Design a protein with these regions (language model features):
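Short glycine/serine/threonine-enriched helix-capping/active-site loop
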Residues: 43-46, 140-141, 148
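Short, conserved alpha-helix that lines the donor NDP-sugar binding/gating region
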Residues: 1-6, 127-128
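Short, high-confidence coil segments that cap the C-terminus of an alpha-helix
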Residues: 10, 38-40, 135
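Catalytic metal- and UDP-sugar-binding loop of GT-A-like glycosyltransferases, i.e.
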Residues: 16-18
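C-terminal, non-catalytic tails of nucleotide-sugar-dependent glycosyltransferases
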Residues: 41, 51-52, 63-91, 100, ...
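Short aromatic/hydrophobic "clamp" motif used to bind/position activated sugar donors
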Residues: 13
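A short, conserved alpha-helix in the catalytic core of glycosyltransferases
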Residues: 27-31, 85-110, 115-144
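Conserved donor NDP-sugar-binding/catalytic core segment of glycosyltransferases
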Residues: 20-65
């Protein structure tokens, strides 16, 4: 991503995975509507799995002592916790599978950490850098796309993949203290281990 961004000349950049399917011609306009506001950092879309359940509706930092996708698996049309899945709102982080940000801000935080966070959590780290700089990251549900990421991704943990993941998890936890991080968008009485926003029992 950093290499690709370095070749661009536009005022804004869009990070977009190659497994994203565009289903609505207005998606980029909807993201730009938020990204051009001066107080905004990164803007992320509402992403569905091919079965139209939610893959991404913002990222909650501290979930699982790291970060998790809000409302993952929620059926299309279900508003989720206080309509979080359906309304534009602040989100401490959003996924880089589909993300728009001003090029100036991308450069300001030195882009994604592709050295210590080569695969996992580099987007969370990127958004946390923007958040720490006083910018507001936004989840924009009016931008809707399909993400052909397998629901079981991450369960395929060959020893070398698991070792890399654990190292990157430790980097995120050490850098941002995510084991104790209190996401202002995630009520303290909600279970930090659950992406479905269930109350603590």
């Amino acid at each position: 991503n950093n290499f690709a961004v370095a070749t661009t000349r536009g005022a804004f950049v869009c990070l977009l995975n190659n497994d994203i399917e565009i289903i609505d011609g207005e998606w980029l306009s909807e993201l730009m509507r938020q990204a051009c506001r001066p107080e905004v950092g990164a803007v992320g879309a509402r992403l569905f799995y091919p079965d139209r359940s939610i893959q991404h509706a913002g990222v909650s930092v501290g979930m699982g002592n790291a970060a998790g996708h809000a409302h993952r698996g929620l059926p299309e049309g279900d508003p989720g916790y206080f309509a979080h899945a359906l309304v534009a709102r602040g989100s401490v982080a959003v996924t880089a599978a589909c993300l728009v940000v001003a090029r100036e801000l991308f450069d300001m935080v030195k882009g994604l950490d592709e050295a210590d966070l080569r695969i996992a959590y580099n987007d969370v780290d990127f958004c946390l850098k923007l958040h720490a700089a006083g910018l507001r990251n936004i989840y924009a549900p009016s931008a809707v796309l399909i993400h052909h990421e397998s629901k079981s991704r991450g369960q395929d943990m060959a020893p070398e993949h698991r070792a890399r993941y654990l190292k990157e998890l430790a980097t995120l936890q050490d850098r941002w203290d995510t084991t104790r991080f209190r996401d202002p968008m995630h009520h303290p009485m909600l279970d930090r281990a659950c992406e479905a926003y269930r109350p603590v029992r």
